[in-house]
Amino acid sequence: MHQLLSDQIVECGLSDFYEVKQQYIEGKNGSQFSFAGLKHNARQLKSFEGVDICWCEEADAISKHSWDILIPTIRKPESEIWVSYNPQLIEDVTHQRFVVNPPASAKVVKIGWQDNPCFPEVLRGEMEHLKAS
């Protein structure tokens, strides 16, 4: 995710606005993207209090233990947790928590590759090849 955002900052001509560091990306307006792994560092999430938006990418791999730490940490009024992943198993903790039995306040939006206006042609070709084989 860090590399993707860094590349987009350059591609969109925003390098003068954002300062890209190894652990975070900071905007001149005080906005900040912070990056943390959940698998081995779930306890460090407690330092993320005050976050407005927490985006969990590849969230299918997030354990119940990590969710149990993260969810109460993101408690600023009007804060949001965004979850994106490719479902593997219906029994996966993330899928159960946010799709099968979502919180009343959840907004669940199912998105596929066809909804991505930037979906690369090379991936489309690979996908079609895999379907055919």
Predicted regions and their residues:
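Phosphate/NTP-binding elements of NTP-utilizing enzymes
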Residues: 1-133
